[in-house]
Amino acid sequence: MKVLIVDDELDVEQLYRQRFRKEIKAGELEMMFAFSATDAMSVLAELAPMDIVLVLSDINMPGLTGFDLLKFTKEKYPHLNVVMVSAYGDADNMNRASSLGASGFLVKPIDFTLLKEKIFSI
Amino acid sequence: MSNSISFDFLIKVLRKVFLFQNLPDHLVKQLSESITTQEFEAGKAIIEKGDEGNAMFVIISGKVKIHDGNEVVAEINEGNFFGEMALLDGEPRSMSVTAIEHTVVAIINRNDFFNVLNDFPAISKNIITQLTRHLRAQNDVLIAQWRSREKELNDLVEKRTEELANKNSELMLVLDNLKLSQQQLVQQEKLASLGQLTAGIAHEIKNPLNFVNNFSQLSLELLEEFKELTDETERAEILTDLKNNLEKINNHGKRADSIVKNMLNHSRTRNDDKQLADLNKMSDEFLHLAYHGMFANNPDFSCYMKTNFAEKLPKVNVFSQDISRVLLNLFNNAMYAVNKRKKLGVMGYEPSVSVTTSTVNNCVLIEVEDNGTGIPETMKDKIFEPFFTTKPSGEGTGLGLSLSYDIITQSHKGKLSVESVVGQYTKFIIQIPV
Ligand SMILES: [Mg+2]
């Protein structure tokens, strides 16, 4: 199972890799990282989307935002699950995410137990 | 000669007149024979200023005033005479004479008068004495008038001076009030920018704090795992992770600390001293604060942020609080401009704000450039003026750039300039001497 994580903070990679160390080691999970929406788009274009089951995207990123990426992904790869992650858990952002087709919304700091459930429920 | 007045009476009257006092009898007689008399009701003019001076008058009965318009020079009555001056110099009358009550005058014509003068030159002495008296009297009146005018004038000057002094102290009060409101406005502008910052600050602190929490939580779990592990390779792996995590905790802790410091610095009333500051670091931090501030207020907002920092930028002595306000103001404006252009909805537009530092001629340059809406040529002169704003009311105080301008040019002896092309870009250039 391949997950693409998109965030402008570089340290999320170390965080996620440690958090999911066992799963990664066991080969249950493969993680890819992109540090901007544009990066993520090229990753998605390169790897067949069927290779990836889930995109986990930050909203507030310089350049294109997580919403731009969400829109792009849902238009191009409608069956791909996108979960939004943001420090701003207000109703506006949540409604916007769901109306654009996000399959979930996680508020930072991330509850990793919840995230694990989310990932493995797919 | 009038029928109602007897010849003898006229002689008596003339005798009483100072001018003719020493005149021999026959001459008085001669004069009396040529005299005519005339009556004037109260208020009637006997002489008008500017009339030809061809006769002199002796008051037989009644009272007249000698005047120039409303200015009364003298009031004279029975036995006195007037109009002799014009008779002598042949000039037009310099004063008017009007009857105050019913008045009868004897009129001595110019020719008759001169005949008497020819026959009895000694009368000249009387004339001169009389003229001197008249002149003196007139002079006294004029001096008195002048004195009263002078006093009036002095009073007026005194009054005006007092009024001015009052006005002046009023103005001083107004000035004091203005200074106070100016301070309040500056404070308001500070608060407004701080308000805008708050969201950015909250986000900018939350991110590193999340990392601190996440990595420390993670490390605790790793330690538990470590205790149970026996495999050396795995233990070594965990130790490496732990070390990395501690570094991350440390870094993000410092990051949050620096943001809080900046915020405190920004909102403090006044820095006492200049401090050596790393303008690269400040530019970077405030670019991000501004970005998150914008984002928190407009969820649709986003832009590319580019930084081109000179590697060996010298530290500069600045009021760091003031410089941070300038940076924040310029970044906010830049982001506002790109957001405005983005809202026009032109395909393929990539909003971008960049900051570039360099050293030129012993000055540190900070260039803040955006590819937003741009500033029209006609506005370029005005943007540094207080209260100039293009933002809708309520969105800007119009003080940001004017304060920034003062901070750079006055407190730091630097320069703040702008380049812009409408629809292409705007670039603000801060220049601060090292
Ligand atoms: Mg982010």
Predicted features along the sequence, with ranges:
Chain A
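Acidic catalytic/metal-coordinating carboxylates
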Residues: 36-39, 65-68
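Active-site beta3 strand of CheY-like receiver
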Residues: 49-56
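Receiver (REC) domain active-site loop signature in two-component systems and cognate sites
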Residues: 61
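Alpha4 helix (beta4-alpha4-beta5 surface) of REC/receiver domains from two-component response regulators
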Residues: 68, 89-104, 114-117
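Receiver (REC) domain switch/active-site region of two-component response regulators
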Residues: 111, 120
